[in-house]
Design a protein with these regions (language model features):
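Active-site environment of divalent metal-dependent phosphoester hydrolases
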Residues: 36-39, 154-159, 186-189, 209-212
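Divalent metal-binding segments
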Residues: 1-80, 97, 106-157, 178, ...
Length: 234
């Protein structure tokens, strides 16, 4: 589908519509949390073409996709690429020392990695990044002082991300590090306490609860887990 979905016409039109929606909503700053997900160079060029104009009344904080920028590069080479992106940032399109990493699979496709008892029908989730590779990436970016965001959807995905944070913090302690769990569909109370103790933040997708909890309670994970999607103290 990529040749159709990512055709120049559709890709450009999608960004133009995004621009209109953000403007209509009155937002002054938005984030692109996985720059390079489709095509790094193309995204940079097209994003600059659409948004680097006087009629763009908002800023975009751009966070690179960690697996993309590290692919076939040493970490030193990766840092050089990211430093160059930051140096060439503008008022509207801004790269900082931040990176987006990925733990387990998508929530809507039920590919989140779950702790026992897992899914009711017996299927298992998927890793977007093997745990040992994710830990390596976390440690490398942590040592270099980056703010790390990790896509996590299942409680096993959360566990792997927190273990990576704990190892990094034990080796090279940092304060106000900004390590953030993104989405966090399922998590245990103990994981929330551990995240707090490690200084992590959570950017939870609470829409999961409203959109999926009823159906997932019936078919996927049962009532107890479905009722605590996006576990927050509210």
């Amino acid at each position: 589908l990529n040749p159709y979905i990512l055709s120049d016409t559709r890709f450009t039109l999608g960004l133009e519509r995004l621009k209109q929606v953000v403007h209509a909503g009155g937002h002054t700053t938005i984030g692109d949390m996985a720059v390079g997900l489709f095509d790094f160079e193309r995204e940079l060029v097209t994003t600059a073409k659409i948004f680097e104009r006087a009629d763009t009344p908002f800023r975009i904080e751009q966070v690179p996709h960690g697996a993309v920028v590290t692919h076939n590069r040493s970490f030193e080479e990766t840092q050089a690429v990211l430093t160059d992106l930051s140096a060439n940032s503008s008022h509207r399109l801004n790269f900082r020392a931040r990176v987006k990493l990925f733990s387990d699979g998508a929530f809507f496709s039920q590919l989140a990695q779950l702790l026992p008892p897992g899914y009711l029908d017996g299927h298992v989730g998927e890793w977007l990044t093997a745990p040992e590779v994710l830990h390596e990436h976390i440690l490398n970016f942590w040592r270099a002082g980056y703010q790390i965001h990790v896509h996590v959807t299942g409680d096993m995905g959360v566990e792997v991300a927190l273990e990576g944070l704990a190892k990094a913090q034990a080796e090279h302690p940092r304060l106000l590090h900004g390590f953030t769990l993104e989405h966090m569909g399922y998590a245990t109370p103990e994981q929330i306490e551990r995240a707090k103790a490690l200084g992590a933040s959570v950017s939870a997708n609470i829409y999961y609860l409203h959109e999926l909890s009823g159906r997932y309670a019936e078919l996927s994970v049962g009532y107890e887990r479905a009722s605590t999607m996006g576990r927050l103290k509210t």
